[in-house]
A protein has these predicted regions:
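Generic helix N-cap/helix-start motif at coil->alpha-helix transitions
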Residues: 22-28, 54-62, 89-96, 126-135, ...
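Alpha-helical adaptor scaffolds
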Residues: 62-66, 82-83, 96-109, 116-124, ...
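TPR/TPR-like (Sel1-like) alpha-helical repeat modules
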Residues: 86-92, 103-107, 113-124, 142, ...
Length: 720
């Protein structure tokens, strides 16, 4: 839409268009088009025509900054940013570019003051610009492990989103981060600053600090809250708010100290455990408490020959490749686990004999571009990885890799590390060959339980001042930090796909059982943390609280609390919007299978089938429940039940739902179920299945080919 002479000028100044940029709007438009077309040099030439008369025009300065950014001429960028800020102090773009420049050229410690000083101002002037800043800050904070700050800035980005696409992008980011096992569960929450009780001193000073925090000056607010806490050292609200603001500012060390101090002063045990958990998790993100991990990179002469050599090494275990993603330019040619011993050396009877992975080997295929040869990466996973392990890979690769020292090759600089308190834990076993899937699942769970209950409990922890959890649990004064250490451990086991039952481990160590939480309204629930929701007393809270807790807990994938929630939903007949009873049963069955509680899985199969009958389910839904029950029977090694269900599926589903047969074949392959009876059913030669089908009028046989050709309803299971 064309601008009128007396419209506000698009440059953002307080002047009217006629008295500001109208005389040069066409020339400015030409510069902007060249920037959009990624022609920065031509854009700068076009901009020169407007100088020196219009050298300080804000639109011209913005476009010149963009051009120099594209040319990576950072010093000129900074000079122009300073000109824009000095000539137009109310232009949010000056501060936006300043923050972007520091994010690219400096570290978070140097960038944080700029963000906290100017972001709220940018949001008031140009919310869309503030949205961009918040999203870029999120990327930086993720790289630094400042996960509570990530949630804070994502929430602010959602407030500043001015389009449906931007809002969807933020919600998608929340969804992806909630699914990430790399982010400990207690961090997946937006905590709120707490109000000071009315009967406490320092009310006026507290209100002033809250105003500072409302302006998103997190570090300044944290220091002021901390100063107030020194006046009233046993008021947990002050130290909690200080710790929370430090966490939002990305100061992990200060956040750990203040949140831990707040936990010490809380009378409620579970709330104290929650804050101590946050403190320990922040501590573990600090570089000084992490053991560095190593990554090596080498040029490959011939990828195919290299793979042939690596396949022969018994301490390398080749992994199935994931499906290729369209956004990946160079998908891996192969991935290997580097094991601590030969891959076939362990036995299922001796958990300590099983090989565990201590590193990974990644090979990227060569491409036609000579600047992109084949590459081999060797990466350590745990501190047990030594120089000898690295040398093993180099020796096996032999002449197929170039070990000549050069920039960007050999040992790569890296900030990656693993916290000392979990460095001695390794859940990544390689099961012996020839096991069924159910046997592998049981072995993996048994090994993970062995690592947690037998090894971790005897491991000296820095968070417990060098004591083991078993020792600390015997001292009532240390119950709170030990329970917090268990919560931290649960976040580690989640990355290994082992769902730790926190209450069970507490009881094993003689610690207090997890105290259930009861809240009477959805508003109370909204103010609760993720950790609080995990201990909800689902049978004692109103139905509306259960309904609102469901999406929150479902997103956490915390198996044991989620199973309790689903039990309560079913027992109390609570309706979950857009989530019917069969769906509840399906999720509960899946979770029961995940933890190998096969009796519960069978019960949920029966409940789900009954629920489907009540709502008049179609054939596909009925088939799904039979497939679920078949999986449970296979995992239970109940061959008679497997045969019964296979015959039923062959009679009722193979013709009408062809994919059913493929799903069953995959299950049978995983479970190594290939007895003659199973083969007969799947090949269509099982006489009982054939006979039952004839009585139903549903079989095809060679003798009835003519009837089939004339449209008869005749078919043999397995006949395609």
């Amino acid at each position: 839409m064309a601008l009128e002479p007396y419209d506000p000028c698009p440059c953002g100044s307080s002047k009217k268009f006629k008295f500001c940029c109208q005389p040069i709007i066409e020339e400015l438009g030409a510069v902007e088009r060249l920037i959009a077309e990624k022609q920065p040099k031509q854009a700068l030439l076009a901009a020169e025509k407007l100088e020196p008369e219009h050298a300080l025009n804000p639109l011209l300065l913005r476009n010149k900054i963009m051009a120099f950014l594209m040319l990576e001429r950072q010093q000129e960028v900074l000079t122009l940013i300073r000109q824009l800020q000095q000539a137009h102090p109310q232009d949010p773009y000056g501060y936006y570019f300043d923050i972007r420049w520091h994010l690219f050229m400096s570290d978070w410690e140097s960038t944080r003051p700029l963000v906290e000083e100017h972001l709220t101002f940018i949001g008031e002037k140009n919310p869309a610009l503030a949205y961009q800043v918040a999203i870029e800050v999120v990327d930086e904070l993720l790289n630094n492990g400042c996960f509570m700050a990530v949630w804070r800035y994502l929430f602010d980005a959602l407030l500043w989103a001015r389009s449906e696409d931007d809002a969807r992008h933020v919600m998608s980011a929340f969804h992806e981060l909630n699914k990430s096992n790399d982010i400990p569960l207690p961090f997946r929450n937006l905590y709120q600053l707490r109000a000071l009780p009315e009967n406490q001193p320092n009310q006026a000073e507290f209100a002033e600090v809250m105003q500072v925090a409302n302006g998103r000056h997190w570090n300044q607010a944290a220091q002021l809250f901390e100063a107030l806490s020194e006046k009233d050292p046993h008021q947990p609200v002050l130290s909690f708010n200080a710790g929370l603001c430090y966490a939002w500012s990305g100061d992990l060390a200060a956040a750990a100290e203040l949140l831990g101090r707040a936990g010490d002063d809380l009378p409620d045990f579970e709330s104290a455990v929650e804050l101590e958990t946050l403190a320990q998790l922040h501590d573990q993100q600090l570089p000084e408490v992490q053991i560095p991990l190593q990554t090596y990179r080498y040029r490959v002469q011939s990828v195919s020959r290299l793979l042939s050599q690596l396949d022969q090494e018994q301490r390398l275990h080749r992994q199935p490749l994931p499906p290729e993603r369209p956004d990946v330019d160079r998908p891996p040619a192969a991935v290997y686990l580097l094991l601590d011993r030969p891959r076939n050396s362990g036995t299922a009877d001796d958990l300590n004999s099983l090989p565990v992975s201590i590193g990974t080997v990644l090979i990227l295929d060569e491409v036609r571009d000579p600047a992109a040869p084949g590459e081999l990466y060797v990466r350590s996973l745990i501190p047990a990885f030594t120089d000898a392990d690295h040398e093993l890979v180099v020796r096996v690769a032999g002449e197929q890799i170039d070990v000549t020292a050069a920039d960007g090759w050999g040992l790569l600089p890296s900030d990656d590390g693993i916290p000392r308190d979990v460095a001695g834990l390794n859940f990544n076993i390689v099961p012996p060959p020839g096991l069924r899937r159910s046997e592998i699942l049981k072995l993996v769970n048994a090994h993970a339980r062995h690592v947690v209950f037998d090894k971790w409990t005897q491991l000296p922890l820095e968070s417990l001042d060098g004591m083991t959890p078993a020792e600390a649990a015997r001292d009532p004064e240390l119950h709170m930090p030990v329970c917090a250490a268990i919560n931290v451990l649960a976040s580690v086991t989640e990355t290994a796909n082992y769902s730790l039952n926190v209450d069970e481990l507490r009881q094993h160590l003689g610690l207090p059982a997890v105290e259930p939480m009861v809240c009477q309204t959805s508003e109370e629930l909204k103010l609760s943390s993720i950790q609080d929701c995990l201990r909800l007393a689902f049978n004692e809270v109103p139905a509306e609280v259960v309904r609102d807790a469901f999406p929150m807990l479902a997103s956490t994938r915390a198996i044991h609390p989620l199973r309790k929630l689903l039990d309560a939903i079913y027992d109390r007949e609570i309706s979950i919007p857009e989530f019917d009873v069969p769906a509840v049963c399906r999720m509960a069955c899946s979770l029961a299978i995940r933890v190998l509680d096969l009796d519960a899985a069978q019960m949920w199969c029966e409940r789900g089938r009954a629920a489907n009958l009540r709502v008049g389910a179609d054939l596909v839904a009925r088939a799904d429940w039979d497939l679920n029950e078949l999986e449970v029977a296979a995992l239970s090694n109940n061959e008679e039940k497997v045969i019964e269900l296979l015959r039923k599926c062959a009679r009722e589903y193979f013709l009408k739902i062809p994919q059913t047969k493929q799903q069953i074949l995959q299950l049978l392959k995983l479970e190594r179920l290939d007895s003659p009876r199973v083969q007969a059913i799947m090949s269509g030669t099982d006489l009982q299945t054939v006979g039952a089908g004839i009585s139903d009028g549903g079989l095809w046989t060679p003798e009835s080919a003519a009837a089939s050709a004339s449209g008869g309803k005749l078919w043999v299971p397995g006949q395609d």
